[in-house]
Amino acid sequence: MTGAATAAENSATQLEFYRKALNFNVIGRYDPKIKQLLFHTPHASLYKWDFKKDEWNKLEYQGVLAIYLRDVSQNTNLLPVSPQEVDIFDSQNGSNNIQVNNGSDNSNRNSSGNGNSYKSNDSLTYNCGKTLSGKDIYNYGLIILNRINPDNFSMGIVPNSVVNKRKVFNAEEDTLNPLECMGVEVKDELVIIKNLKHEVYGIWIHTVSDRQNIYELIKYLLENEPKDSFA
């Protein structure tokens, strides 16, 4: 390797380190419990599936997407458990078969006649993200640092084993604030996530290789016991 190539590689490494540090610090303003940045990608756009209309709706969230480890060791609450919902963590703020034929990043996703479909037994539709409240069990977070307006998008990520244990060992809280196991898959150019409130989001990621990487990371986080740190 030539001196010029080595210098270029070192410069790229330093730039990546700077970006990670910057993203960590920015996320920390919104979520002080951030512990470790696990992955980030420079540009993502967000869609939400409308169960009633059977179509994707493009949301006003575009920017850096990051997935990170959170410190939940203090066993604190996000909000008091209440039968009434109040927005806090998810900010926009079964077996599911998802088909997305048009993978381009444009507003045509919200046309029900273009072959896009999400089939589910759930007939509910929500106008905004549901609340995550009660005991803070959200081991991981996903955030889009929005370039369009001041509102960021965030989503709590919890291993499915934690959700299932909550149903058994904390049934009262689960009754007041029920959570469902999350799911993730990648279809065409969307990473599709079913969140804890059974809402479905599609994330279009500009960097092609990052789509599979983000899918595999979220899948790993959901299918394994929570970790305190990653090497």
From Swiss-Prot:
Coiled-coil region list: none
Subcellular compartments: Cytoplasm, P-body
Keyword Cytoplasm in annotation: yes
GO biological process, one term: mRNA processing
Record keywords, A-Z: Cytoplasm, mRNA processing, Nonsense-mediated mRNA decay, Phosphoprotein, RNA-binding
Reported modifications of this chain: Phosphorylated.
Disulfide-linked positions: none
Result for mutant: residue 47 to F: In DCP1-35; partial loss of mRNA decapping activity
Assembly information from the UniProt record: Component of the decapping complex composed of DCP1 and DCP2. Interacts with mRNAs, DHH1, LSM1, LSM2, LSM3, LSM4, LSM5, LSM6, LSM7, and the cap-binding proteins PAB1 and TIF4632/eIF-4G.
Name of the protein described by the UniProt record: mRNA-decapping enzyme subunit 1
Organism annotation: Saccharomyces cerevisiae (strain ATCC 204508 / S288c) (Baker's yeast)
Gene (name only): DCP1
